[in-house]
């Protein structure tokens, strides 16, 4: 393989994909025989900034303090590849990982849509337009059916709130759901923005609109793979597909993706597409999105990068058995007192521990018997102290 493509889909819940038990991704399901599927993959954080430090720099969000700008102490995968002479190209429409915040380092081409007009209701460029830009770039990069090895990162925003999908995708999910764009936007403002889960019926409508977007994204993925085939590069490319985080629909009393560390936000889909593969391979080992940059380095045949804290996912036989971490700022209540507090999680085998600085509290869950994280067993659990010891060194470490 000559090329590596990283496809990230904002706010993609694991449980909506057909290969993970959902039912809204027929195209993605159709290519599973060419994929390695990671069933125990975890994000380094529950929202964009906390997650993409793992995905693109193989580091953790709070290592260099509560910085909005990308620290110069972090090394982007694009910087590593650029130095190795590999063409680096990125297309996305998310302001939290924009040029303004320093995420454009090391890219030969970096499109973040910040100079373009976006819709009043939907404040991002949609996947079909991102695909057009990718196609235009490939048409110039690929000459006479060949091209210089490249790393391409594409990030879709269509799953992100405010959840205003096209009518045809709503009909696939629930044809009885008749709403205008204005009604969908009003639901977003009245329910989602206010994090109001008191009316389960309205929350369920939000979930259906979200699932309609999932079906829309699946069509965008089909178009994207079609572009790769048309430009004669798919047969020479690895494709890594994942998300930054999921979205909540009332599972733990909220909506969207605030500073929480429950599975609906941080247990994420992750798969690697290999065009010559003939049978799907499943990996049930605990892995992290922090492992993505080292994996890309491995696929290009480069030397490991000592700045990266993850481990290459490939070959699977060499991946170490270890726990996974995540960290972020807990944004709940910050609008009231202007102060954000740390929140951390650590998972090891079947147990997951969460620490909230806001109220100095701990939660512990046995995911084997309690996958929805309802029964906090921190009091009296024989695993509690050992799990705390694994997490304590990370708490407020940037202040030390």
Question: What are these model-predicted stretches?
Answer:
Residues 1-400:
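Catalytic domains that recognize anionic headgroups
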């Amino acid at each position: 393989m000559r090329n590596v493509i990283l496809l990230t889909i904002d706010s993609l819940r694991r449980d909506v994909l057909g290969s993970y038990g959902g039912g809204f991704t027929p195209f993605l399901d159709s290519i599973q025989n060419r994929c390695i599927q990671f069933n125990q993959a975890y994000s380094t954080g529950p929202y964009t900034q906390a997650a993409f430090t793992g995905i693109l720099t193989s580091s953790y969000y709070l290592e260099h303090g509560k910085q909005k700008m990308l620290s110069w102490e972090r090394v982007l995968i694009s910087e590593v590849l650029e130095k190795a002479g590999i063409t680096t190209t990125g297309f996305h429409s998310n302001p939290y990982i924009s040029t303004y915040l320093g995420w454009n380092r090391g890219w030969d081409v970096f499109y973040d849509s910040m100079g373009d007009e976006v819709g009043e209701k939907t404040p991002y460029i949609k996947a079909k337009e991102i695909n057009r830009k990718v196609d235009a770039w490939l048409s110039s990069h690929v000459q006479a059916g060949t091209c210089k090895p490249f790393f391409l990162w594409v990030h879709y925003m269509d799953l992100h709130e405010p959840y205003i999908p096209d009518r045809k995708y709503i009909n696939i999910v629930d044809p009885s759901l008749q709403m205008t764009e204005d009604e969908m936007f009003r639901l977003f403002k009245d329910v989602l923005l206010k994090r109001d889960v008191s009316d389960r019926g309205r929350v369920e409508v939000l979930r259906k609109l979200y699932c309609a977007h999932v079906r829309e994204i699946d069509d965008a993925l089909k178009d994207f793979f079609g572009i790769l085939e048309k430009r004669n590069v798919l047969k020479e490319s690895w494709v890594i597909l994942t998300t930054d985080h999921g979205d909540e629909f009332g599972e733990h009393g909220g909506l969207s993706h605030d500073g929480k560390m429950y599975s609906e936000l941080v247990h994420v889909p992750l798969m690697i597409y290999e065009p010559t593969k003939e049978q799907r391979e499943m990996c049930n080992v605990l892995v992290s999105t922090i492992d993505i940059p080292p994996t890309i380095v491995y696929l290009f045949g480069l030397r490991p990068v000592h700045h990266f804290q993850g481990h290459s996912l490939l070959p699977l036989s060499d991946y170490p058995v270890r726990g996974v971490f995540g960290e972020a700022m807990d944004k709940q209540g910050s609008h009231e007192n202007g102060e954000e507090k740390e929140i951390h999680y650590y998972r090891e085998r079947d147990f997951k521990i969460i620490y909230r600085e806001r109220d100095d509290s701990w939660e512990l869950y046995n995911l084997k018997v309690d996958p929805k994280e309802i029964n906090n067993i921190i009091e009296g659990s024989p695993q509690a102290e050992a799990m705390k010891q694994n997490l304590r060194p990370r708490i407020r470490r940037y202040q030390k």
